């Protein structure tokens, strides 16, 4: 059958003849081996409504604390699995080791079952996908490298195999820049495939810090983040030089990063508020003791804040890299009840001269996106507001993407799951108009107005 993804038909991530390129983000599905039917319905409806070029999963696909992983689960990466602790306390025999290995094999089968249910709708429609990790995936007892290896067993997965850098199956002509599990980059070419217009960077933003709170990207991942825009430009230039009508490639390819944790600077999209102010939310850890509301001058209509932004305690320097190395947007998950889009100014004071021209294209600053859970297996907003996020790029202004939440209530209807549970929303629901409808679906009111104009 003909792939739903235009890029899959072309064999690479590429802008269409229409000048558009679409990414669908799914985050914090966070379920066990039996994925909620409502989650699958949301995925299917979102794919059919948006026809994305690629789907990006931004972490916590696996609820590593699920009872299915009771024999192998671990709370922290540096701690032993529960099964290992129990066996050590009772026996050091080879029999105990065999029992634990059998438990690990059951965990692998359970993780494989979760992944299969999540990506089957994508495979059925011929849509490529990529995945990074959060703070719960590894808790099942498998490392991110092994989970990534399981993901690569399924068609359409673009996560690179350490043995090679070429994406296979759906996108045989796609270049992939690899770093480590969950951290890699995918260039997106122009309509003629003569140059790279932008890059999609997936970043493993870490899990937990030994000092407390959430972790940060590894030093290697941060170095990769800083260098990949120039790496993409160098690779693209080699292709450009062999193309007769080639356009000059910039020193760096502007990029957008997708990751699990928001960075501390997301708080720049908020403003302090009185404890009893309407829709005020207390900050998280380092920001605790103060209350905040969204800054309407910095965020788009329809944004809502349902919980404190749960960022790492330490500033890893990631934001400075995004500012200075050619990034125009960051999209994160993790906070299941937050859904907002805003822009913060970019400081160019210490930018490399080579980056000046690239940064000048990012005229609006750095776009920062927070998305609610796409799943029904854990906490979140009311079930009708669990959502996928569409991000649409236009070749005329590729570094100013438009984005839209695709909520279950609008796409599917009334959820059937009794498993999903919601914390009380302390912010207003999405207003009637969230801005432009990227799906271009006429409402009954717009149909009536159109009829009256005839």
Question: What are these model-predicted stretches?
Answer:
Residues 19-22, 50-55, 123-130, 196-198, ...:
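Loop/turn elements at helix/coil->beta-strand transitions in domains of secreted/extracellular proteins
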Residues 51-53, 199-202, 213-339:
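His/acidic metal-ligating clusters that form di-metal
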Residues 188-189, 304, 310, 338-446, ...:
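Binuclear metal-dependent phosphoesterase catalytic core
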Residues 28, 43, 55, 60, ...:
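Divalent metal-coordination and catalytic microenvironments
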Residues 32-34, 63-66, 131-142, 208-211, ...:
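Active-site environment of divalent metal-dependent phosphoester hydrolases
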Residues 9, 80-249, 368:
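Extended active-site neighborhood of metal-dependent phosphoesterases/phosphodiesterases
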